[in-house]
């Protein structure tokens, strides 16, 4: 009885290790990165609400960030969508 339990436990541990390894590989393939998106062509500035809206339309898990401010810390010139993206093949 003890050997059957020991064998079953060993097989269970090996199975769990393999499953965790596969899940880890899948999650690792998604990478956190930012991609630039165009800003309002009329003003040439990034509006946070518009930037967030574009990013949400692109993919659910992305966050919009206005970037590249002038020397006074105002007038952002770039919209970036950051988050987990699927792998590039």
Curated annotation (Swiss-Prot):
Disulfide bonds: 34-82, 46-66, 51-79, 55-81
Pfam families: SLR1-BP (PF07333)
Protein name (database record): Defensin-like protein 147
GO cellular component entries: extracellular region
Signal peptide annotation: 1-24
Record-stated family: Belongs to the DEFL family.
Location(s), subcellular: Secreted
